[in-house]
Amino acid sequence: MGQLDNTIVVFTTDNGAENITFPDGGTTPFKGGKLTTWEGGMRAPLLVRWPGQIKPGTVKTEIFAALDWVPTLVNIAGGPKGDALKKQIESGQYPGIVKTTLDGVDQTEYLAGRSEKSAREVFFYYTGSQPSAVRYKNWKFYYTMVPDTATGGLYGATTYHWTQIVNIKRDPFEQTVGADAKSLLAYAGSIGSPSTAYLYDWNILPIGQLLWTKELMSYKEFPPMQAPETYNLDGILKAMQQSGHRSQ
């Protein structure tokens, strides 16, 4: 058996298409792009070669986050399995440098085809350090979003007056959510759809609230390690003013 037969090859990217630099940055059929929490900014291609485990040509459509690679590859390499790695990290045993938590989940069974379901049911979307949206299974809850234009990620996020929610499998291109006129018209059309579907969407709103409450409460024991940098003009000018001095 050669070395390649004992090696997992992963080809992916860290974000959706950077359509602000089209055509070099790529394009996507999904809404938004890099620097946004729309699906166009979060969905990324993923190719995996794992001889003897993943059959060539296999297509998987369940949730898989880049965060999941750490516990998954550690498991495959012979390290702690399942939640064991997370427990070690939270107790400060591993890597022994800092006490924190692990947001990834072990996806070994899903990748190997021993489970048809992903081990991940929830994914949190952040705009910088600001909670933006959350996905639970096929449902995505929207709270604070940037414009879905190519340059939307360069501007501040807008907090919606009410939570928007959509079945992302039913509307993968997010046509019925957003603040632009086209989205609002589509949203109105969805209200006119079978009332059972519309009412069901709104009846599960507490799920998103409970998920975010649990996520934010975890900051008490495991606070963010550092604040993200700001790239908006106001923040840059303020930093320049604070670092300089007035002429005498």
Predicted feature residues:
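Metal-dependent active-site segment of extracytoplasmic phospho-/sulfohydrolases and closely related
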Residues: 1-22
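Surface-exposed helix-capping loop/turn segments at secondary-structure junctions
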Residues: 1-6, 78-88, 116-118, 214-235
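Stable alpha-helical elements in mature extracytoplasmic
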Residues: 3, 66-69, 73, 103, ...
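Beta-strand elements within well-structured catalytic alpha/beta cores of enzymes
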Residues: 8-13, 46-47, 69, 73-74
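C-terminal cap/loop subdomain of S1 sulfatases and analogous C-terminal strand-loop tails that border
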Residues: 17-39, 55-58, 62, 67-175
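The feature captures the short pre-catalytic strand/loop hairpin that immediately precedes
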Residues: 47-56
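Long, internal low-complexity/basic segments
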Residues: 141, 147-148, 155-164, 168-248
